[in-house]
Amino acid sequence: MRKGQKFFFVELTDTFGGEANYSWVKRYKVTASSFNGAIRKVAKDTYYRFRKEYDTGDMVKYKAIGACVCAFVEEYNELCHADYSRVIEL
């Protein structure tokens, strides 16, 4: 990991009526220097283009353009996120 970079946790899921549905979910542990850098890496892996919907300070929600998909990006916390299975590392 390069200087200035940290881990981010990204949850990618489907939407129904504009809200996250979680009928399927892909989870990522991403090394990046910002929330935007983390979603760029996920976009490159999934071929979705994302637009920021809102930012709460510790979590950012992105919506995929032209698809019923959203992504939640937050800083990786070992206590909260280590128990998830099948997390893709980018």
Segments from the language model and where they lie:
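N-terminal cationic leader/targeting segments used for protein routing and processing
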Residues: 4-7, 27-30, 62-64, 78
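A short, exposed loop/beta-hairpin motif centered on an aromatic-Gly-Thr core
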Residues: 21-37
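Short aromatic-glycine-(Arg/Gly/Cys) micro-motifs in beta-strand/loop hairpins
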Residues: 2-25
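Short, mixed-charge low-complexity intrinsically disordered segments
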Residues: 48-90
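A short, charged, amphipathic alpha-helix used as a generic interaction element across diverse proteins
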Residues: 33-57
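Intrinsically disordered, low-complexity Ser/Thr/Pro-rich tracts
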Residues: 28-31, 41-43, 62, 73
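Intrinsically disordered, low-complexity segments enriched in small/polar residues
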Residues: 2, 15-16, 30, 35, ...
